[in-house]
Amino acid sequence: ANKRPVWIMGHMVNAVYQIDEFVNLGANSIDTDVS
């Protein structure tokens, strides 16, 4: 069987405190919007 990684992305994490929120919801990757 060909196993491929699954990414559960926390999208638009714009503040440090949001990282824990997204990880607690099951995210295993974080997408930030930096300008």
Curated annotation (Swiss-Prot):
* Any one GO molecular function term: phosphoric diester hydrolase activity
**The keyword Cell wall biogenesis/degradation appears for this protein:** no
Question: Which reaction is catalysed here?
Answer: an N-(acyl)-sphingosylphosphocholine = an N-(acyl)-sphingosyl-1,3-cyclic phosphate + choline; an N-(acyl)-sphingosylphosphoethanolamine = an N-(acyl)-sphingosyl-1,3-cyclic phosphate + ethanolamine; a 1-acyl-sn-glycero-3-phosphocholine = a 1-acyl-sn-glycero-2,3-cyclic phosphate + choline; a 1-acyl-sn-glycero-3-phosphoethanolamine = a 1-acyl-sn-glycero-2,3-cyclic phosphate + ethanolamine
Q: Sorted alphabetically, which keywords does the UniProt record give?
A: Cytolysis, Dermonecrotic toxin, Disulfide bond, Hemolysis, Lipid degradation, Lipid metabolism, Lyase, Magnesium, Metal-binding, Secreted, Toxin
Post-translational modification, as annotated: Contains 2 disulfide bonds.
> Any keyword Zinc?
no
One GO BP on record is: killing of cells of another organism
What is written in the cofactor note of this entry?
Binds 1 Mg(2+) ion per subunit.
Q: Which InterPro entries match?
A: PLC-like_Pdiesterase_TIM-brl
- Co-factor requirement: Mg(2+)
State the protein's purpose: Dermonecrotic toxins cleave the phosphodiester linkage between the phosphate and headgroup of certain phospholipids (sphingolipid and lysolipid substrates), forming an alcohol (often choline) and a cyclic phosphate. This toxin acts on sphingomyelin (SM). It may also act on ceramide phosphoethanolamine (CPE), lysophosphatidylcholine (LPC) and lysophosphatidylethanolamine (LPE), but not on lysophosphatidylserine (LPS), and lysophosphatidylglycerol (LPG). It acts by transphosphatidylation, releasing exclusively cyclic phosphate products as second products.
Family named by the database record: Belongs to the arthropod phospholipase D family. Class II subfamily.
Entry protein name: Dermonecrotic toxin LrSicTox-alphaI-1
Species of origin reads Loxosceles reclusa (Brown recluse spider)
